[in-house]
């Protein structure tokens, strides 16, 4: 696709823990773009079937917008045509790293790209392609939720298994809502087998010194 002459592309990443309103923010952006008569395409990973298996993005508040289900990032490209002004992508943490090059390309073609995702997984590690998307974004909107323990701002997602903190060796991806996850602040986010008062080298780097 050749670069458009009108409009200016950009990448906005909306991130935060679960229950922070990320998807709701995407839906608001979509509605605003519709009011401006912009042509929009929305995508979400096929794996995200928490609230619907249909071709739609659904917020926790059950608000929806139509969406195309994709298995891999390159599935987006065949849908991009010259009249598209805005591309919306939900739950980007579940996508492969090709999404980084793809959204960079779309923005360079003067398409507005708005992405949401969890920047941290349940262990507090950078999640999937999200750190790279945050690095190349023109705008980052960091949302917070409310910690289920302290009632303070929450920027992490606590995984619970049978109501107790998960072990760090649990699978990274566990699709689900309140039955498995709740928002927590830094102080109250924990893993059953990790002592947070010690440096956890493997969480952030392969180097031990």
UniProtKB/Swiss-Prot annotation:
| Single biological process term from Gene Ontology | DNA biosynthetic process
- Major place of residence: cytoplasm
Enzyme class, broadest EC rank: transferase
Please give the subunit comment from the record: Homotetramer.
User: In the UniProt record, does the keyword Nucleus occur?
Assistant: no
Where is the protein situated, by its record's location annotation? Cytoplasm
Name its species. Onion yellows phytoplasma (strain OY-M)
- Which NCBIfam families did the record assign? PRK04296.1-1 (NF003296)
Keyword terms, alphabetized: ATP-binding, Cytoplasm, DNA synthesis, Kinase, Nucleotide-binding, Transferase
Reaction catalysed?
A: thymidine + ATP = dTMP + ADP + H(+)
Kindly identify the residues recorded as the active site.
91 (proton acceptor)
> What does the entry list under GO cellular component?
cytosol
Protein name, entry field: Thymidine kinase
State its Enzyme Commission number(s).
2.7.1.21
Give the signal peptide, or none.
none
Q: Where does ATP bind?
A: 16-23, 90-93
Q: Which family does it belong to?
A: Belongs to the thymidine kinase family.
Q: Name one Pfam family in it.
A: TK
Q: Name one GO molecular function term.
A: thymidine kinase activity
What stretch or stretches form a coiled coil here?
none
Looking at the UniProt entry, the stretches that span the membrane are none
């Amino acid at each position: 696709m050749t670069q458009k002459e009108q409009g200016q592309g950009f990448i906005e990443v909306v991130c935060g823990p679960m229950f922070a309103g990320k998807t709701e923010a995407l839906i608001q952006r979509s509605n605003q773009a519709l009011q401006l008569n912009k042509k929009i395409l929305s995508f979400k990973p096929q794996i995200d079937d928490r609230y619907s298996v249909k071709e739609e993005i659904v917020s926790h508040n059950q608000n929806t917008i139509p969406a195309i289900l994709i298995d891999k990032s390159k599935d987006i490209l065949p849908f991009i045509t010259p009249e598209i002004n805005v591309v919306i992508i939900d739950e980007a943490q579940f996508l492969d790293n090709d999404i980084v090059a793809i959204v960079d390309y779309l923005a360079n073609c003067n398409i507005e790209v708005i992405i949401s995702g969890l920047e941290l997984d349940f262990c507090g590690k950078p999640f999937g392609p999200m750190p790279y998307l945050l690095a190349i974004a023109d705008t980052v909107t960091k949302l917070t939720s409310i910690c289920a323990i302290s009632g303070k701002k929450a920027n992490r997602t606590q995984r619970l298994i049978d109501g107790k903190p998960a072990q760090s060796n649990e699978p990274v991806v566990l699709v689900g809502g309140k039955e498995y996850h709740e928002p927590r602040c830094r102080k109250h986010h924990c893993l059953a087998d990790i002592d947070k008062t010690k440096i956890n080298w493997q969480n952030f780097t392969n180097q031990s010194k």
